[in-house]
Amino acid sequence: MYVIVDIQGQQMKVEQGRRLFVHHIKDVESGASVEFDKVLLVDNNGAIAVGSPLVEGAKVVCEVLTPLVKGDKVLIFHKKRRKGYRKLNGHRQQFTEILVKEVVA
């Protein structure tokens, strides 16, 4: 059984027991329980239920494993040819690691 759920603007295919990295969720602690109720599709062993836009009564219960994980550094390089202009910027995206405990459909 899997569901497609909208987590902070990203649609993810989720199954029970799966670990996910989602955009940083503020004000949560390790071990806290988080619910996501924007379920778009439910596949229960071949029986597919598609919401319009959401599936009624379906939700995903997750546990926060690591509240703040930083991703790899992304480098942004700007250059204007023949002018000697070069600029290097970068950032590290923040994520939250969660574990899917239960899928209620």
Swiss-Prot record:
MF-aspect GO terms: rRNA binding; structural constituent of ribosome
SUPFAM superfamilies associated with the record: L21p-like (SSF141091)
Highest rank taxon of the organism: Bacteria
Gene Ontology terms: cellular component: cytoplasm; ribonucleoprotein complex; ribosome
Entry keywords, A to Z: Ribonucleoprotein, Ribosomal protein, RNA-binding, rRNA-binding
Any one GO BP annotation for this protein: translation
InterPro entries: bL21-like, bL21-like_sf, Ribosomal_bL21
Assembly mode: Part of the 50S ribosomal subunit. Contacts protein L20.
Family: Belongs to the bacterial ribosomal protein bL21 family.
NCBIfam families for this protein: L21
Function text: This protein binds to 23S rRNA in the presence of protein L20.
PANTHER family (UniProt xref): 50S RIBOSOMAL PROTEIN L21 (PTHR21349), LARGE RIBOSOMAL SUBUNIT PROTEIN BL21M (PTHR21349:SF0)
Full protein name: Large ribosomal subunit protein bL21
Annotated source species: Porphyromonas gingivalis (strain ATCC 33277 / DSM 20709 / CIP 103683 / JCM 12257 / NCTC 11834 / 2561)
Top-level taxonomy: Bacteria, Pseudomonadati, Bacteroidota, Bacteroidia, Bacteroidales
